[in-house]
Amino acid sequence: MSPVKLIVVFAACLALLAANSPSSGPPLLMERSAPSDLEITGMAAGVTPGTVRYISYERLLTLPQTTVTVTGDDNFRELPQQKLAVTGVYLDVLESSLRALPGSDLLIALCSDGYRATYPRDYVKIHRPILALKINGLPVETWVARTHSDDPGAYFITHAGFTPSFSVLSFQEIPKIPAKVTRLEFGTSQQVYGAISPHQRDAANPQVIDGFRIAQQHCFRCHNLGSYGGTKAGKPWQTLGSFASSSPAIFERYLRDPKSVDPKSTMSCDPQLGEPAAKALQAYFQTFATTPH
């Protein structure tokens, strides 16, 4: 056989192998095949706007994985001395594997309890968050059934380690480690964070800007403005705005010790929240009491 024919045959064989490879082709399903399927929405190839696609746990296992040792994850607070070997997929690898569209620069993790975590590109690059698939070599649900008292769900996001990359006044960046993740949505920072950006007339107020930066990192996880942000707290942005405007002293107490104001609150206490940070949050949220955004 001539060299040219050999090259053609070899190329054809490679193409056939690629076509039959479990990682080739679109990985998304049109319909749910199992309760453990992860929902995918937004700006990804093969996802029509407004629709939901699915990726199975088995399919996720075919993606490039990493195994890291995790300590200090608040989802496992009752195991403070135990190091966990977590196997999963880096979010940036997941984005490329699911073929996020070029305009997408934000990944949003939605959880069954209404919590949401937003991952802009700089966070993903600096902190390398991981979608966990296994703990100590076991599927998360299997490991939980054997060893753990608090269920993080089929999917959670964690880090090998976390060091804050910035601070706003006394507020330090905190890790985004959602549990019970049911959906990943690809979107844009401009659209999502734009919903809670300060009004143009307040854009030059440094106190409002500081409050926005803190709220964007922290409050947005459990409080929503329309379809953006989390719903876990049951208190939307406008409610916080009215609260900050009408009862600033109580609002500040809510920031430091939420259960003293709302016994049903699941928000963690922050008794060390500095006065400038608390005032910045007040100033920012007060703009939502009367100003349409």
Kindly give the residue locations of the regions a language model identified.
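Long, contiguous alpha-helical scaffold regions
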Residues: 12, 290-293
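Extracytoplasmic electron-transfer domains, predominantly the class I c-type cytochrome c fold
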Residues: 238-291
